[in-house]
Amino acid sequence: MSIVTHRIKEYAALLADAEKTGVGTNPLTSIDPNLSVTEAYHIQLENIQMKVEQGLIIVGKKIGLTSLAMQKLLGVDEPDYGHLLNNMEVANGGTIPIEKVLQPKVEAELAFVLKKDLMGPNITTLDVLQATDYIVPALEIVDSRVKDWKIKLPDTIADNASSGFYVLGDKKAKVDEINLELLGMVLSKNDEIVNTGVGAAALGNPATCVAWLANKLSEFGISLKAGEVILSGALSAAADAKAGDTFSARFAHLGQVSVHF
């Protein structure tokens, strides 16, 4: 085993232990300031592969850091991605036990469900629209296995892009039924509006985010599969969640999606 491979397995184990024990780890970049983005993706894949071997199923992907504000905050110029597993979906209106998360935040976004595979490179926004079966409103519960969210880009990538859970709404729409750029969203916490957003907040168009993902995945020989759920990126800033909170997001033409802690 090479030194790099050993290091990737070691860091993957730190994150896996943090998830198992509920105690956050120190940032990997504080342990290894030279940790690269490519190595971070391999750490993520190491833990995903382990979960698949334990019987979990990859059901989709999530895209993070799609807003310019978040990219500037972490000093990066492109998004990142993580994997969605079958134990991460929560029913619309369902409850997430607070002991299942470490330091959760809630984001509202649009989910794309594909009707055909997409394999980069050179995938365009139009390719994504043509490959999309339907779009559905979603809440993503982001979470970090890193103490106090003290993350740099390699930290969040290694940590499956700070994924936690996700909730899909009930109303499905075809891409020609809505204007993705102008689609408005209102995020409420305990019946008080905490954030508003619009489709253009995600790289100008959420479908552009999905195209980026297809092209990025091709660097690792991975394609987007028909039937997969793709969370296309937050339409506003994330809101902190604690026990007893209820979140709901209302989308123009797409109805409401909610979750309780």
Label the model's feature ranges.
Residues L217:
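Conserved PLP-enzyme active-site core in the AAT-like
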Residues S2-L203, T246, L254-F261:
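Catalytic-core "active-site belt" of small-molecule-metabolizing enzymes
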Residues T208:
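Glycine-rich, small/acidic residue-mixed loop/short-helix segments
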